[in-house]
Amino acid sequence: MDNTLTLIKTVYEINQLEEIAAPQIILAGRSNVGKSSLINCLASRKKLAKISSTPGKTRSLNYYEVSPHGYYIVDLPGYGYARCSKTERAKWAKLIDKYLLDNAYVAAAAVLLDSRHNPQQNDLDLISYFKHCNIPIIPIMTKSDKTKQKDRSKVQKKWEDILKVKPICVSSKTGMNRTRLWNLLDVTAIPELAEIEEETE
């Protein structure tokens, strides 16, 4: 049975935050890295997450429920977009900090990395932030259809050297590694699913 995604909640302000007692996987990455496209790819729907030609359009925390497993993918605002004001960026930072504060339900952070570029300081800073919060990292290299295998492998190796884990390469356009990514997200959010898979093999 294929997973389905449903947008359950959108949070713009700190006072809208409330505890959701279910496993959560954060989806984070630079503006224009392809977060909305990846959500739509995972959901097999074109318009679940709005895609904009303007980077940094996601300005809220978006909670997507994953059925049938009952965990959540929480899409964070994109970072690194210069045209957003300092005030707005500070507001997002406070919202994200508050969301993470004492949130025992965060299972991991899926950090999206553009496969066309070498490691960027913005990405390294974000990964350091999550590690400081003791949040495991799932590195995902997006837009893999736009790169040659040889070039992509070089970037992948650089990230593997930094993170000590090999990023998964995906493409929202072609669906590359979609099923593999779903399996990874499932067992990260609910480790018991890995045991069930082993029993059915």
UniProtKB/Swiss-Prot annotation:
Cited InterPro entries: G_ENGB_dom, GTP-bd, GTP-bd_ribosome_bio_YsxC, P-loop_NTPase
Record GO biological process: division septum assembly
Family, similarity comment: Belongs to the TRAFAC class TrmE-Era-EngA-EngB-Septin-like GTPase superfamily. EngB GTPase family.
Binding site for Mg(2+): 36, 58
Species of provenance: Maridesulfovibrio salexigens (strain ATCC 14822 / DSM 2638 / NCIMB 8403 / VKM B-1763)
Domain EngB-type G: 21-191
Pfam families for the chain: MMR_HSR1
Listed GO MF terms: GTP binding; metal ion binding
Cofactor(s) essential for the protein: Mg(2+)
The protein's name: Probable GTP-binding protein EngB
CC terms in the record's Gene Ontology section: cytosol
Physiological role: Necessary for normal cell division and for the maintenance of normal septation.
CDD domains: YihA_EngB
Residues involved in GTP binding: 29-36, 56-60, 75-78, 142-145, 168-172
Keywords assigned: Cell cycle, Cell division, GTP-binding, Magnesium, Metal-binding, Nucleotide-binding, Septation
